[in-house]
Structure formats: C-alpha cells, structure tokens
Amino acid sequence: MSDTLPGTTLPDDNHDRPWWGLPCTVTPCFGARLVQEGNRLHYLADRAGIRGLFSDADAYHLDQAFPLLMKQLELMLTSGELNPRHQHTVTLYAKGLTCKADTLSSCDYVYLAVYPTPEMKN
C-alpha cells in the first residue's frame, strides 16, 4: 500500500482520471475497486486513486489502517454482512479514518472510499 501514497500531500483532484472507488463527496478521499475472489480481496494499485489533499498524518494512518480494513471486509464477506449479490454499504472506522464499502451488486468487486473521520461539533 505504501507505494501508492507518495505525493498524497500534493494537490491532485484526479478529475482527469477514472474514480474506481465508492462514490464519495468527502475530500480528501482514497477510493479503490478491490477484486473479490471468494472471501478474499485483492488490491490493485491501478484501480485506486486519491482525491484531495491528505495530511501527512492521515496518509500515514491510511497506510497503517488499510491492511486492517481489508481483513475486516474479508470477514464481512465470510459472515455475509457484505454480499456480492446485494447492494449494502458497510462502514468501518480505524485510526481516525472512515471506510465505506459496498459490492454494488457486482459479483467480483468491492468498492470502497476511505476518508478522515469528520470531527463532531458540540
């Protein structure tokens, strides 16, 4: 994962490239289309992208949290909470990040969007 993060602190809205992840209006946002093989997920760097400007701390947290998020999504595939035949968005939280994921009823892919968890205002 870390080989996909260089330059995340440089402005790049990626409007000239396809967005592979789950549709997301929050910026910054990391999006990816993961390949599903049974209950396993595979990350392909050419099917991922970043919109907006991640802080160095958030980019570091994304690098740390991504393997954990992948494992949690695989467990959700195993339990049936994430189902390739039914559209259903799941939300995970790790290291100050929010991850939304959904199969979008596609039998071979899981789409995700990861972004810094917004702070709650009192």
From Swiss-Prot:
Protein's UniProt keywords contain S-adenosyl-L-methionine: no
GO terms under cellular component: cytoplasm
Family, as annotated: Belongs to the CbeA/YafW/YfjZ antitoxin family.
Disruption phenotype: Single deletion has no effect on expression of cognate toxin cbtA i.e. the probable operon is not autoregulatory. Deletion of 3 type IV antitoxin genes (cbeA, yafW, yfjZ) has no effect on cell growth.
Subunit-structure text: Homodimer. Interacts with polymerized and monomeric MreB and polymerized FtsZ.
Residues bound to Mg(2+): 86, 88, 102
Cofactor descriptive note: Binds 1 Mg(2+) ion per subunit.
UniProt subcellular location: Cytoplasm
Note: Encoded in prophage CP4-44.
Identification of the protein by name: Cytoskeleton bundling-enhancing antitoxin CbeA
Function: Antitoxin component of a type IV toxin-antitoxin (TA) system. Antitoxin that counteracts the effect of its cognate toxin CbtA (YeeV). It does not bind to the toxin but instead binds to MreB and FtsZ (the toxin targets), enhancing their polymerization by forming higher-order bundles; it is probably retained in the MreB and FtsZ filament bundles. The mechanism has been proposed to require intergenic DNA, in cis, between the cbeA (yeeU) and cbta (yeeV) genes. The intergenic region was not found to be necessary in another study.
GO biological process terms, semicolon-separated: negative regulation of cell killing; positive regulation of cytoskeleton organization
Keyword list, A-Z: Cytoplasm, Magnesium, Metal-binding, Toxin-antitoxin system
Induction field: Expressed in mid-log phase at considerably lower levels than antitoxin relB.
Predominant cellular place of this UniProt entry's protein: cytoplasm
InterPro entries: Antitoxin_CbeA, CbeA_sf
Coiled coil: none
Cofactor(s) listed in the protein's UniProt record: Mg(2+)
Source species: Escherichia coli (strain K12)
